[in-house]
Design a protein with these regions (language model features):
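Sequence-level detector for tyrosine residue identity
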Residues: 35, 40-46, 50, 99, ...
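Active-site catalytic loop in hydrolytic enzyme cores
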Residues: 1-87, 100-104
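Alpha-helix boundary/capping residues
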Residues: 22, 93, 177-180
Length: 225
């Protein structure tokens, strides 16, 4: 398995946490799919090895409770992170980055969000590099506060940014999101995923084309953006 992991390092250089990507986006590139293994692709085996709590992990650190993810287009994941006590969500993107999606992660869940995205490619042309020309331009890595206010922005070029997080003041006022689940539970109970979990348990695709074929064989519906 080729894993997509987010790694949290402490100031001493030691690994604090490793969070495995929960799921890959499907149906983005006609004729091609990602063949890296996310939790959803091996779900039953993952639960057997690590337990349900590890599906959406939150690392407790001395600077705050931190969750990490490279997942896009699924705000339910970040709401669940907030339910589990996340105070800082670190998100990453390699193109296809929606600035407002990142800002609204903070706005809807009343927490801090960090996003690291591709900057401008100033070197030789890389055929696999996403320039984000259709998404408002490259870069724009940023830090957002609990009400979705931008605290720092890197712009288009590779840049270091920082912002102070008054974690104790934040905790004094912070509450988990207020969700009226009773209204929505009947709808969620009727929903069927586009494809079932565990698609990569028995056989791993060896290429993007094989992953695409496997997706078509298992998908209940197919659409492309």
């Amino acid at each position: 398995h080729i894993l997509h992991l987010m790694v949290l390092m402490g100031p001493d250089g030691n690994v604090v946490a490793k969070h495995w990507k929960q799921r890959n986006v499907r149906g983005l590139f006609p004729g091609s799919e990602q063949y890296t293994s996310a939790i959803y692709d091996v779900y039953d085996r993952f639960i057997e090895m690590y337990g349900e709590d590890a599906v959406i992990p939150v690392a407790k650190t001395d600077i705050g409770n931190i969750a990490m993810s490279a997942v896009q287009f699924e705000p339910e994941l970040f709401r669940c992170m907030a339910f589990k006590g996340a105070e800082i969500i670190c998100r990453v993107a390699t193109g296809g980055f929606e600035y407002e999606d990142m800002r609204l992660t903070s706005y809807h869940n009343s927490l801090y969000t960090l996003i690291a995205n591709n900057s401008v490619n100033t070197g030789k042309r890389n055929p696999g590099f996403f320039d984000d020309t259709a998404y408002g331009g490259p870069g724009r890595s940023a830090i957002f506060g609990p009400r979705g206010l931008e605290l720092a922005n890197a712009g288009a070029f590779e840049t270091k940014i920082s912002a102070s997080i008054p974690i104790q003041d934040f905790r004094d006022k912070h509450r988990i999101p207020d969700l009226h689940l009773k209204l929505y539970q009947p709808v969620f109970d009727q929903y069927q995923e586009r494809y079932d979990p565990g698609m990569y348990l028995d056989e791993l695709p060896q290429s993007k084309q094989e992953a695409y074929k496997k997706f078509l064989e298992n998908a209940r519906w197919v659409h492309y953006w």
